[in-house]
Amino acid sequence: ADEGLADRTRVVGDVMVDVLLDVARRPDDDPLLAGRLPTSPYVLATIHRAENTDDPTRLASVIDALASIDAPVVLPRHPRLRDRCAAAGISLEGGNLNPIEPLSYAEMVWAVQGSVAVATDSGGLQKEAFVLGRPVTTLRTETEWVETLAGGWNVLLPGLEDIGATVLRPAPTSPRGTPYGAGDAAERSLAALAAF
């Protein structure tokens, strides 16, 4: 407000939501994705942040917790995760883990759409899962996207307690709303610029 821009500021939404929804509307017929995801209900998990991977004890706890979830857990091998597990002698093959090679952006969107839930420490994936209507469990103490916490769509679980029940909780019935826009941020931006 001190800059004197309040009268000229327009909230139009997040153009990344525009991209997400555009990709989500495309057919998920990528032959590279075929056969890489379970046909039964699965959880999509991603782990790569330093707070979950740099300490071998914490990393082992996270991997063990994910492996204990009572559903297949698809876990793309992020390079940091792969390297830290290899250095610590931690296997990604145990329990219900289904480790796969990293996914492209479109493949990740389709994997979220096919999942029943998401468990992650990724900032972007929290928001994407929320926008796509999947319950997300964030394995961190905080989120950049506080709007995702409303109604229980995103639950912070840094301590990993009751991870199975938390990750596999029923999808909330509360409306998510569109705090990041409805997929029309680009058009709204152009309209706002044209109106100046």
Task: Label each residue range with its predicted role.
Residues 1-53, 57:
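A nucleotide-sugar donor-handling region in carbohydrate enzymes
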Residues 59-62, 105-108:
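Acidic, amphipathic alpha-helical patches
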Residues 63-77:
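A conserved nucleotide-sugar
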Residues 78-96:
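Short, structured helix-loop element that forms part of the nucleotide-activated donor/catalytic region
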Residues 95-104:
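Active-site donor-binding acidic/aromatic loop of nucleotide-activated sugar
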Residues 108-148:
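A donor-sugar binding/catalytic signature common to diverse glycosyltransferases
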Residues 137, 152-156:
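A short acidic/histidine/glycine-rich donor-binding loop in glycosyltransferase catalytic cores
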Residues 155-196:
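Leloir-type glycosyltransferase catalytic cores
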